[in-house]
Amino acid sequence: MSLKHFLNTQDWSRAELDALLTQAALFKRNKLGSELKGKSIALVFFNPSMRTRTSFELGAFQLGGHAVVLQPGKDAWPIEFNLGTVMDGDTEEHIAEVARVLGRYVDLIGVRAFPKFVDWSKDREDQVLKSFAKYSPVPVINMETITHPCQELAHALALQEHFGTQDLRGKKYVLTWTYHPKPLNTAVANSALTIATRMGMDVTLLCPTPDYILDQRYMDWAAQNVVESGGSLQVSHDIDSAYAGADVVYAKSWGALPFFGNWEPEKPIRDQYQHFIVDERKMALTNNGVFSHCLPLRRNVKATDAVMDSPNCIAIDEAENRLHVQKAIMAALASQAGIGNRE
């Protein structure tokens, strides 16, 4: 049997994702379990985290397991990922050894590695995550690289809870770009587009100009999901028409890919669109829609205080659900035949 990882949700069937969400809902009602008893996970962070680290550490503990946090370049050796490299620079270990050694110690490996924001053609290859999956003898979990599949499931669960059903078909879903003073990763936007179309919703990607449309890979995933799950997909640059009648508004900021690695000329363009902030006027156009965001969020930059403090904001519910869906993911991966068997 081939080893199953959790690198992105497109690799999992809809039935498998539904099973994870069902299990996550059960974990939400019953916090403690023994699914990871005697098992461990290495959480490898190349970038900072609050929710991801906290929820994975606590999730492993609540299921009877143990988490070890590693930060290469800080409390662990810097890692080389290119084959054939003469390692006479800053890196001390090659991923071929790192992943295999960790796999002898632990039962799961989580990886968080953001793009370097220099060359999108390289960053979109997701080298760090794919290298861990290539060499690791145990399942690897994407804790956010160029997608954020754990956030996807937390978001989906929050929507199912709010609407009181697992069937989200027919809901109008707006994924809106919002302003941020810095160009940010497209990971959460890629993932939101993916899961919303996977759930069969009518999805509108709202962004200022065509330069802010997401990478074609994720647009293609979304189009494929529309065919398989129903729903629809459109791109809009018109704020009012996009918000009109929306059931869900999901906000995220990201840098324009044509300027990737050359951000200076992108900034004055981005600065023109600060009015994309999610505010009461825009939310009033919706169908009493819910608002959410992956967090962290800069108040009164991405969304106003009034929107964040509204009873229609489910961002905190979504953040809580990170704990529950990640427990479901860890439990499912650790249950594979041979995982945890050191004999």
UniProtKB/Swiss-Prot annotation:
Oligomer status and interactors: Homotrimer.
UniProt GO cellular component terms: cytoplasm
Lineage, uppermost ranks: Bacteria, Pseudomonadati, Pseudomonadota, Gammaproteobacteria, Lysobacterales
Matches recorded under InterPro entries: ArgF, Asp/Orn_carbamoyltranf_P-bd, Asp/Orn_carbamoylTrfase, Asp/Orn_carbamoylTrfase_sf, Asp_carbamoyltransf_Asp/Orn-bd
Catalytic reaction annotation: N(2)-acetyl-L-ornithine + carbamoyl phosphate = N(2)-acetyl-L-citrulline + phosphate + H(+)
Family recorded in the similarity comment: Belongs to the aspartate/ornithine carbamoyltransferase superfamily. AOTCase family.
Cell location: Cytoplasm
Protein name (database record): N-acetylornithine carbamoyltransferase
Organism the protein comes from: Xanthomonas axonopodis pv. citri (strain 306)
Enzyme class: transferase
Binding site residues for N(2)-acetyl-L-ornithine: E144, K252, L295
Binding site for carbamoyl phosphate: S49, M50, R51, T52, W77, R112, H148, P149, C150, Q151, C294, L295, R322
Protein activity control: Carboxylation at Lys-302 increases the catalytic activity of the enzyme.
PANTHER family reported for this sequence: ORNITHINE CARBAMOYLTRANSFERASE, MITOCHONDRIAL (PTHR45753), ORNITHINE TRANSCARBAMYLASE, MITOCHONDRIAL (PTHR45753:SF3)
Site-annotated residues for Key residue in conferring substrate specificity for N-acetyl-L-ornithine versus N-succinyl-L-ornithine: E92
BP terms from Gene Ontology: arginine biosynthetic process via ornithine; citrulline biosynthetic process; L-arginine biosynthetic process
